Amino acid sequence: LTLGLDTVLGGQSLSPYYTMSKSDYHTDADSVSIGMGVGGFFTVGERHSFSYGYSYSDSKGNHNSSDDTARETNSIGHGYTFNHDYIFTEIISTSIGLGYSDSDAIVDAGNDYETYDFSLGVNLSFPWAYIAISNGMSFNDYKKEDSSVASDRLRSDFTNTFDIMLTKAIGDILPAIDQNRNLFINLSYENGISEATTFNYDSHSDSFSLSFTKSF
């Protein structure tokens, strides 16, 4: 279930929302998740725009005969975001994002953590193509040692994600099949590196995607 509202108040766009989901498993503990929050957006002059958000989550799992530890990961979460976009020229714009979230579970070990996010992006609106380049960093700091992994080491994770996307009108390449230039090809590449103080969580990934979109 999702309920949302978009409105304008005091020159700002506001979007409060509420979500609820429930999973009934035949052979595992049932789970219920409730979330709510609000997002806001406003501009300053013609070049600056700001967005922000707050989110709250409450996740619960019930004990049953098949899973008598589900309740241990019941958690309350709070999240905050703030973003700034700036238009340098008709071609170049930038975006900076900050985020913080906190999760508190019944059993602290391996479940309680704080997350700090930072991202930087550059958008290039060339006449011949649109290119978006961004890099995001995320730091996870756990609050208590997880004895099932390393009882003498407090886990801390660092994740760096770099991606680049190119969008181009098919009509620039094959005008015969896209005379109105409203069919686009999208190419993207993403590189993700995750490092942790416990090597069990180290990873490195690369992904590529190709898609087509059409506007009417």
Language model segments and positions:
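Gram-negative and organellar
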Residues: 1-216
